[in-house]
Design a protein with these regions (language model features):
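Catalytic active-site module of serine/aspartate enzymes centered on a nucleophile-bearing elbow/loop
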Residues: 139-159
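Gly/Ser-rich "nucleophile elbow"/oxyanion-hole loop immediately N-terminal to the catalytic nucleophile
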Residues: 1-18, 25-31
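Short beta-strand immediately N-terminal to the catalytic nucleophile in serine-hydrolase-like folds
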Residues: 10-12, 37, 74
């Protein structure tokens, strides 16, 4: 296959989102951008006990480093599996600007790194532990809300 090595992306939901964060942080020369939906940020846990604490919203690492590759994060504020604070921890320390809106019948707050478009955080109001804008026939998908797939593809195109 003739793959453009400059246009390789990784994305995932929940543990897959955490793995996407790890892959982007560990191999920044391989991935052009990362998409995380309802997952833990890089370096938020070091073992099972700290992972479970992080999933409950407790910050277990002294500081989560800002992503070194462009990263877009989605998280529902009613997620009872992985607390939504994890999405915020993944961009803590960045200078941010926020906007609110509604898509697919669900309100959201979108936060973008000030001065560059390499970090985006979407807090989905009323959403749980499911892929936003997904097909109702799927598992861990929520047809309500912004289309996370479409927004990740938009973000990847400008990353």
């Amino acid at each position: 296959y003739n793959v453009d090595a400059r246009r390789v992306y990784v994305a995932g939901l929940s543990a897959g989102g955490a793995m996407a964060a790890i892959m982007g942080a560990t191999y920044p020369d391989l991935y052009a951008a990362v998409g995380i939906h309802s997952g833990l940020p890089y370096a938020s846990a070091r073992d099972m006990a700290s992972a479970l604490a992080a999933m409950r919203g407790h910050r277990t690492a002294a500081a989560t480093p800002l992503p070194s590759v462009p990263t877009i994060v989605f998280h529902g504020d009613r997620d009872t599996t992985v607390h939504h604070r994890n999405g915020e921890y993944g961009i803590a320390g960045a200078e941010l600007r926020s906007e609110t809106g509604e898509a697919g019948g669900r309100a959201f707050t979108r936060t973008v790194h000030q001065g560059r478009s390499s970090l985006e955080h979407w807090l989905l109001h009323g959403a749980g532990h499911a892929w936003s804008g997904g097909d109702a026939a799927g598992s861990y998908t929520d047809p309500a809300g912004p289309d996370a797939t479409r927004e990740m593809l938009r973000f990847f195109a400008i990353a």
